[in-house]
């Protein structure tokens, strides 16, 4: 089974994260940031991933360090779980509606880290979650995993719905990208490596 367990401890955060790419029944998220827990749960469920996260952070300051560091550890786990990337689709994309909002995510498991984020999040805060941290999370995952990730809110009026559409689309796009494909021999690249 393709999986990874990693931990990261700094003076700001303490993170333990387990990711299973081929098992989807075990999802348990505890970051101390309620809205972020909800989004990670949606990502795992819609991507059909097993994901367990335990995080403690300096949320008395704000949630920035916790959200970014969870993104870093998730990216590291994804990179390790994919091993040599043989036989995977490599690319994945998904449009996901959430009521009036539409989110889009495209992924290339390329070995090159890049993140493009486009979306107007008009409400600056949802509970204890600063909405600008949505971009920070995606950027942290992309850089740690060495993937290219494009995330875009096409339209919508409710900030919660916009972010939810993105996290669901992220799960679905990543599922497509990491899926094994019997028609692909080796890695899906003319270079012979990713």
UniProtKB/Swiss-Prot annotation:
EC supergroup of this enzyme: lyase
GO terms of biological process kind: L-histidine biosynthetic process
Principal location: cytoplasm
Catalysed transformations (reactions): D-erythro-1-(imidazol-4-yl)glycerol 3-phosphate = 3-(imidazol-4-yl)-2-oxopropyl phosphate + H2O
Annotated compartments: Cytoplasm
UniProt EC number: 4.2.1.19
Keyword set includes Lyase: yes
CC terms in the record's Gene Ontology section: cytoplasm
Keyword Isomerase found: no
InterPro entries named in the record: IGPD_sf (IPR038494), ImidazoleglycerolP_deHydtase (IPR000807), ImidazoleglycerP_deHydtase_CS (IPR020565), Ribosomal_Su5_D2-typ_SF (IPR020568)
Pathway the protein acts in: Amino-acid biosynthesis; L-histidine biosynthesis; L-histidine from 5-phospho-alpha-D-ribose 1-diphosphate: step 6/9
PROSITE patterns noted in UniProt: IGP_DEHYDRATASE_1, IGP_DEHYDRATASE_2
Key words of the record: Amino-acid biosynthesis, Cytoplasm, Histidine biosynthesis, Lyase
Alphabetized GO MF terms: imidazoleglycerol-phosphate dehydratase activity
SUPFAM superfamilies: Ribosomal protein S5 domain 2-like (SSF54211)
Family, as annotated: Belongs to the imidazoleglycerol-phosphate dehydratase family.
NCBIfam families reported for this sequence: PRK00951.1-2, PRK00951.2-1, PRK00951.2-4
PANTHER family listed in its UniProt record: IMIDAZOLEGLYCEROL-PHOSPHATE DEHYDRATASE, IMIDAZOLEGLYCEROL-PHOSPHATE DEHYDRATASE HIS7
Protein name listed in UniProt: Imidazoleglycerol-phosphate dehydratase
UniProt source species: Bacillus cereus (strain ATCC 14579 / DSM 31 / CCUG 7414 / JCM 2152 / NBRC 15305 / NCIMB 9373 / NCTC 2599 / NRRL B-3711)
Top-level taxonomy: Bacteria, Bacillati, Bacillota, Bacilli, Bacillales
Gene name as annotated: hisB
């Amino acid at each position: 089974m393709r999986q990874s367990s990693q931990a990261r401890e700094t003076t700001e955060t303490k993170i333990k994260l387990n990711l299973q790419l081929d098992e989807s029944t075990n999802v348990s998220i505890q970051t101390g940031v309620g809205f972020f827990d909800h989004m990670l749960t949606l990502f795992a469920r819609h991507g059909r991933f097993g994901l367990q996260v335990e995080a403690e952070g300096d949320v008395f300051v704000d949630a920035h360090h916790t959200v970014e560091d969870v993104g870093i550890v998730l990216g590291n786990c994804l990179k390790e779980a994919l091993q040599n990337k043989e036989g995977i689709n490599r690319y994945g994309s998904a449009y996901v509606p959430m009521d009036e909002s539409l989110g889009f995510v495209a992924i290339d498991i390329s070995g090159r880290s890049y993140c493009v984020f486009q979306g107007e999040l008009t409400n600056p805060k949802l509970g204890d979650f600063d909405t600008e941290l949505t971009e920070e999370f995606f950027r942290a995952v992309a850089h740690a995993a060495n993937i290219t990730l494009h995330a875009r809110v096409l339209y919508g009026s409710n900030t919660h719905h916009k972010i939810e559409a993105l996290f669901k689309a992220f799960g679905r796009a990543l599922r497509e990208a990491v899926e094994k494909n019997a028609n692909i021999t080796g890695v899906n690249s003319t270079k012979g490596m990713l």
